[in-house]
Amino acid sequence: VTVLVFGAGGQIGQELLRSLSGRVVCAVTRSGRLPNGRGCVQADFGQPETLRALLDAQRPVQVVNAAAYTAVDRAESEPDVVFRINAQAPGVIAHWCAEHGVPLVHYSTDYVFDGQGTSPYGVDDPVAPLNIYGASKLAGECAVRAAGGCSLILRTSWVYAAHGHNFLRTMLRLGAASECLRVVADQIGTPTAAGLIADVTAQLLMEQVQSRHAGIWHLTAAGQTSWHGFAEEIFVQAQACGLMMRVPQVQAIGSVVYPTAARRPGYSCLDTTALVEAFGIVLPDWRQGVRGVLDEIVNRSR
């Protein structure tokens, strides 16, 4: 086995299988099956102590951890489960990788920040998560870094894809059934296609990740918008590519009008300059990612 991918059935995981299609890959999911029904290796992040035996059996040369608990609001009601999956499990994986000299790529989130900033956050800016999900991902970062070894932690944001549960797919579903939608306009971030994250990850792995690369990096598309702006762009492009005959009116609202169990940062854009300069990576505008995902949905429906 060359590359072991935890969370291969998720949004980023499925895209990783595409990006790494030229490599020997061991796919790992919670159910032991991929979305296409094919069998794969099973792992339960709710039982972190079992992961070491799995890694011993597979002996990967590189590891990517795309598994996570990502239900931000539900996380508020079951913090023990969330921390096992998002903090303890990555720590076990990172320790195994450090002991065996295996590079690890682990994903984190913009929600480690409190959103009080007004310009893109750098990797060394102070962290102060507002919710259980963000706190668990920060604990995961700390666990991975404490293990030592060659671990790259890629913080990303507002992830979406043509598959899975995400904002873009939710908007398409609601927009087809409604003439008017109300969407939060006072949370600012960068929508980032899972395919972009996977492609950059594959490039990093191909560059033979070295210990000097270890640490935290920020990886998002370029630009910024609000959830309201994201929704409007989705509908404009969906109509342009023939996915929707009519588009709903999108009304901008404040977060106070749409209360959620978990508090979210008002501003969570990430500064990707370090990643771009260190690896020569080109990060396209976020709107380009929307177009690519909508094109994929159109092609799948044919």
Where are the predicted features?
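NAD(P)-dependent short-chain dehydrogenase/reductase
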Residues: 145-189, 194-203
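Catalytic helix-loop patch of NAD(P)-dependent Rossmann-fold dehydrogenases
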Residues: 84, 88-92, 112-154, 158-159
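Adenosine-cofactor binding site in Rossmann-like domains, unifying the SAM/SAH pocket
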Residues: 26-50
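SDR active-site strand-loop-helix element
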Residues: 6, 28, 63-67, 104-109, ...
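NAD(P)H-binding glycine-rich loop region in Rossmannoid oxidoreductase-like domains
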Residues: 42-85
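N-terminal Rossmann NAD(P)H-binding glycine-rich loop of SDR-like oxidoreductase domains
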Residues: 1-22
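Mid/C-terminal beta-alpha module of Rossmann-like enzyme folds, strongest
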Residues: 200, 207-260
